Amino acid sequence: GVPVYHSKNLVNWELTGYCLDRRSQLELEDCRNSGGIYAPTIRYHKGMFYMITTNVTDKGNFVVHTEDINSEWSEPAWIDQGGIDPSLFFDDDDKCYYCSTGIIDGVRGIVAFEINPLTGVILSEKKLISEGCGGQCPEGPHIYKKDGWYYLMIAEGGTEYAHRETIQRSYNVYGPYEACPDNPVISHKEYKKSEIQATGHADLLEDENGNWWLVFLGIRRFSHALLHNLGRETFLAPVKWENGWPVVGYNGNGTIELVMDAPLPGLDCEESSANIRIDKQSGQPILYADHSVDIDFTDELLDKRLQYTRNPDTSKYI
């Protein structure tokens, strides 16, 4: 459960292992369809990797950690907080804050509090920091800090065609938060002819060159009707900052395209040079993701890219 991939250019990714590789970490007995693990988030702080997520089939929200991302992860540290889509934020003073969906005094929204990420112990009062920016189902929260501002980014509108991503900011981690005047920062809700739809549930990152990116979910429709057969996929889009707010893509309207021009990192590495092709329409070199799969079934052990539905039952192996 929860595969970990590594990349030098944000386009070509190699599977390196799994955060959850044993039943003591991941109990999936009697797991229903669309059950199990929801929305994992990975963070790194002072030599430690953290992965926080929800097992909706078991005991809810938990965090695991490791100093070596290519080795085993810890046993789960369970967190006494309901809701889904948890995330961690480490402030300048090393305090760690948890945020997820939740309910405080009957009000549903985004809940935050200080936490010990190694043990899951809650260290402060739980507070409702946002009810969203007007869309239904505010979820998938992430907190960032940039230039003295705390930014709270959340998904809204549900996970179908009204999906979108909004952002707010405050000088205090607990708010009050003011909404970006140009929200949503990404959405294809009003662009039904776009090949990409249902964009949202995003995370921001800054690369080694100081360039910003948005990684998010979306779907690719395959006909004039809003139909798709691959489900929600992972997308990447360039981000620039204007007037203290992130602007996604280059269209100025919160939409992206399947092919975009952006300064990717690591273009001089071997993984990049092996996957650069000339675009037939523009004649320009484009870095493509390599989706090819080559598995040798003569090996004694199964390839780590193969997964078993729910907890493995070795009695069914041949």
What are these regions, as identified by a protein language model?
Residues G1-I318:
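Carbohydrate-active catalytic/glycan-binding domains of CAZyme proteins
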